[in-house]
Amino acid sequence: MPAQSQHPVDTLIFARWIIPVAPNCTPLAEHALAIRNGEICALLPAKEAETIEAAEVLRLDNHVLMPGLINAHGHAAMSLFRGMADDKPLHTWLNDHIWPAEGRWVDEAFVRDGCELAIAEMLRSGTTTFSDMYFFPEAAAGIIRKAGIRAQLSFPIFDFPCAWGSGPVKLFLLA
């Protein structure tokens, strides 16, 4: 993406490597990204970028700059169950460990705390968007808004009782 102009920019980010999505995710060494009015306006070799005036300059000499990662399937609050019987086969893990633990521990506060942990970990590791399917989605939504991360929430509807409701009709009405 060539520079649109040599006009001043808001932010200029120099990075050891930049991995743009287009044309084909080819890593670019010693490049810079220019941002004006909240939008990328140029991606160019670092030597060319040195001539551009910027209000803010970031030098990430040992970093890779790339688009945010997207977690397309998750149960963020379950971060609090991490490591629980994770060596068991799926149905044993669910039936004998996870579902009983959810019945005992999951409530609105659990979902808030688990989402805070999961979102902090996602943001720290470069995830900027995630999909979440879990109980008390309104509690998750509050944490998502507070953190400023993008998310797609879906509502669990199944034919057995849980902490959020009981049976498909009641769960559907909550959604």
Describe these PLM feature segments.
Residues 76, 137, 158-159:
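Glycine-rich beta-alpha junction loops
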Residues 82-149, 175:
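Alpha-helical scaffold segments that flank or form the walls of functional sites
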